[in-house]
Amino acid sequence: MKKVFVKTYGCQMNEYDSDKMVDVLNASQGLEATDNVEDADVILFNTCSVREKAQEKVFSELGRMKALKAVKPDLVIGVGGCVASQEGASIVSRAPYVDVVFGPQTLHRLPDLIARRQRTGQSQVDISFPEIEKFDHLPPARVEGPSAFVSIMEGCSKYCSYCVVPYTRGEEVSRPFEDVLAEVAGLAEQGVREVTLLGQNVNAYRGKMGDTSEIADFALLIEYVAEIPGIERIRYTTSHPKEFTSRLVELYGRCDKLVNHLHLPVQHASDRILMAMKRGYSVLEYKSIIRRLRALRPDMSMSSDFIVGFPGETDADFDKLMAMIEEIGYDTSFSFIFSPRPGTPAANLHDDTPREVKLQRLQRLQATIEENVQRISQGMVGTVQRILVEGPARKDPTELHGRTENNRVVNFALPGVPQAGRDRLVGQLVDVSITQAFPHSLRGEIVVRQ
């Protein structure tokens, strides 16, 4: 049986796309995924261009594949994702042994691109933006476990000054309302209990409803997803503060299937820096969203994205960011030093902050977040948490593991319960009393109801 190896860089959208690449090649050519690159007949790199030196990292990986290609001439090497969108045919110019180059919106054409390459002997490049077409050509998702991702929209129209996403993934395009619901319903029938709705700006969703001119917003979509039998938990990422409507806030007061955790990127806490970033909201507006959410759910946990060292960031600006992190008490974050991306407005901004200062700021921020994480984890000891059981624990397969609503991994034993009994719990929501907190997980005991 032929095999495909996919290496994924970047966000959850890329993870979702990588799964779809495997699904497409499995449905069309019977390929199965492998974790061993040397066993593969097709090697794909699903790339990300958000961080610094992304292109060079890709070419470095490709360089290592050249020797493998020499040994296996029929090996197919492909580059997809956002670096592919940016670089296009220049990838083949620099690495002529690459067979196919495709963008995020053309991954469904992968079988045709590979067939054309094998037929003509010419490398194939397709980095077009055919709207939402790819979803019409993807095979049904293959379910692995009780949780699944569902992409509901693509692209971004916000054009933040530092970000390449609108240029590499195109502008915002939403999937039709019924298509999303049908996919979620199909997943639920296969045993999925938790869905994560995905989009670059997921709460900018505006899906066409049937043959009418009516448009469903994100809040309405969630309401309908919550009514699908079998779905017990709903997550989403990544949301944008500018699109966080009052309807969406109010939904947290009446939809208990929305988890008690939200990832809402703020990027910074200085209005001057936010304006330079072209984020489209103020610090006060962002805090207002958090305040209204916590009025409905006082113990709601928050995570965020932060950029330190943006051009012009002063010590005072950074102190504002640290103060907000303390005030909101973020539970985990994705934090980075600003890296200028070619072709973005921010790449042309004057930046005189030394690299060492930026690094010190990042380390200070991450240390504070880590303290928050440990404090929150310790605070969960002695509480009873609702856990979605995902399967055997990684370190001890005789135990089970699951996740809390705020994404903590919880391991727990079931003394005296046979394997069949443990297997039946996978995909179920159970109550677990938390007994210990570790740096990256929790431990607990299942609560048996009399």
Curated annotation (Swiss-Prot):
Catalytic activity field: N(6)-dimethylallyladenosine(37) in tRNA + (sulfur carrier)-SH + AH2 + 2 S-adenosyl-L-methionine = 2-methylsulfanyl-N(6)-dimethylallyladenosine(37) in tRNA + (sulfur carrier)-H + 5'-deoxyadenosine + L-methionine + A + S-adenosyl-L-homocysteine + 2 H(+)
A GO term from the CC aspect: cytosol
EC number(s) from the headed UniProt entry: 2.8.4.3
Keyword match S-adenosyl-L-methionine: yes
Note describing how the cofactor binds: Binds 2 [4Fe-4S] clusters. One cluster is coordinated with 3 cysteines and an exchangeable S-adenosyl-L-methionine.
UniProt keyword terms in alphabetical order: 4Fe-4S, Cytoplasm, Iron, Iron-sulfur, Metal-binding, S-adenosyl-L-methionine, Transferase, tRNA processing
Alphabetized GO MF terms: 4 iron, 4 sulfur cluster binding; metal ion binding; N6-isopentenyladenosine methylthiotransferase activity
Binding residue positions for [4Fe-4S] cluster 2: C156, C160, C163
Cofactor names: [4Fe-4S] cluster
InterPro entries reported for this sequence: Elp3/MiaA/NifB-like_rSAM, Methylthiotransferase, Methylthiotransferase_CS, Methylthiotransferase_N, Methylthiotransferase_N_sf, MiaB_methiolase, rSAM, rSAM_horseshoe
Stored SMART domains: Elp3
CDD domains: Radical_SAM (cd01335)
Stretches assigned to the TRAM domain: 378-448
Binding site for [4Fe-4S] cluster 1: C11, C48, C82
Main localization of the protein described in the UniProt heading: cytoplasm
Chain ranges of the Radical SAM core domain: 142-375
Listed NCBIfam families: miaB-methiolase (TIGR01574), MiaB/RimO family radical SAM methylthiotransferase (TIGR00089)
Function field: Catalyzes the methylthiolation of N6-(dimethylallyl)adenosine (i(6)A), leading to the formation of 2-methylthio-N6-(dimethylallyl)adenosine (ms(2)i(6)A) at position 37 in tRNAs that read codons beginning with uridine.
Subunit field text: Monomer.
Protein name: tRNA-2-methylthio-N(6)-dimethylallyladenosine synthase
Native species: Cupriavidus taiwanensis (strain DSM 17343 / BCRC 17206 / CCUG 44338 / CIP 107171 / LMG 19424 / R1)
